[in-house]
């Protein structure tokens, strides 16, 4: 009688093994100084972050600005005219972007519960902490963050970057220029400007009598240069382009 046999089996895919070995990379935030900025490694991404815009942001926050910049100060008065607002470095602004990208996946997609829990933990860690690592049980990672799930997670982050590049630079034509998301206790606004993406985090206080109140005195904000995300996104035909195509964008940043 003929019988089924497993005499010949191909070896386990080595590439898949190498991906499995690096699943913990989503729980590590590696920041190293580089010429003119920093290199950040998270997941399977390597970001090259220039120290672009920091001087300009601080200058706009001072009272000694040229008249042409007053429009920018007025538009973002809660950032530049607010003595209690705080400027954060570009790598921290990027960290917030990544946290929002994960949160976007958590809120919009039907994820299996275990995987959803991991995405939630990672997004909260990126958004609320500045530590270089978060401990997630290896067993939990092994069960719920498989190689395929890891790929889905990274692809979701890239899709969020693509969504950001569909924004128009702040303009006077009424075209969308910001992505906003409300989380527990905070509101995050990502706005496309000439130099890249302005990231602001506002604290929200919820009072029984009045509902939500945005506490602008506790705003933190930073700037991520466009080139940082450009290399990790795909430009589609018809998407808005950057500064050189925006003759009507009169903002200083």
Swiss-Prot record:
Classification via InterPro entries: Filo_VP24
Top-rank taxon: Viruses
Pfam name, any one: Filo_VP24
Keyword Membrane among UniProt keywords: yes
Membrane topology, from the record: Peripheral membrane protein
GO annotation (BP), single: viral process
UniProt similarity note: Belongs to the filoviridae membrane-associated protein VP24 family.
Subunit text: Monomer or homotetramer (Potential). Interacts with the nucleoprotein.
Function: May act as a minor matrix protein that plays a role in assembly of viral nucleocapsid and virion budding. Unlike Ebola VP24, mVP24 has no measurable impact of host dendritic cell function.
Protein name (record): Membrane-associated protein VP24
Originating species: Lake Victoria marburgvirus (strain Angola/2005)
Taxonomic lineage of the native organism: Viruses, Riboviria, Orthornavirae, Negarnaviricota, Haploviricotina
Gene that encodes it: VP24
């Amino acid at each position: 009688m003929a019988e089924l046999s497993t005499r010949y089996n191909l070896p386990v895919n080595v590439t898949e093994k190498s991906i499995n070995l690096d699943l913990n990379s989503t729980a590590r935030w590696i920041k190293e100084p580089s010429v003119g900025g920093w290199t950040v490694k998270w997941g399977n991404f390597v970001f090259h972050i220039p120290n672009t815009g920091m001087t300009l942001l601080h200058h706009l926050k001072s009272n000694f600005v040229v008249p042409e910049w007053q429009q920018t100060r007025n538009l973002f008065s809660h950032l530049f005219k607010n003595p209690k607002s705080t400027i954060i470095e570009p790598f921290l602004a990027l960290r917030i972007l990544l946290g929002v990208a994960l949160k976007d996946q958590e809120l919009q997609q039907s994820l299996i519960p275990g995987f959803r829990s991991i995405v939630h933990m990672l997004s909260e860690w990126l958004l609320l902490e500045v530590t270089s690592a978060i401990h997630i049980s290896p067993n939990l990672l092994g069960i719920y963050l498989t190689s395929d799930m890891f790929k889905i997670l990274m692809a979701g982050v890239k899709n969020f970057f693509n969504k950001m590049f569909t924004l128009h630079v702040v303009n006077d034509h009424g075209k969308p220029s910001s992505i906003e998301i409300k989380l527990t206790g905070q509101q995050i606004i990502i706005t496309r400007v000439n130099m890249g993406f302005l990231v602001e985090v506002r604290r929200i206080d919820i009072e029984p009598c009045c509902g939500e109140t945005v506490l602008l005195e506790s705003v933190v904000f930073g700037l991520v240069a466009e080139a940082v995300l450009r290399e990790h996104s795909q430009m589609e035909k018809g998407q808005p382009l950057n500064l050189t195509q925006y003759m009507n964008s009169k903002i200083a940043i």
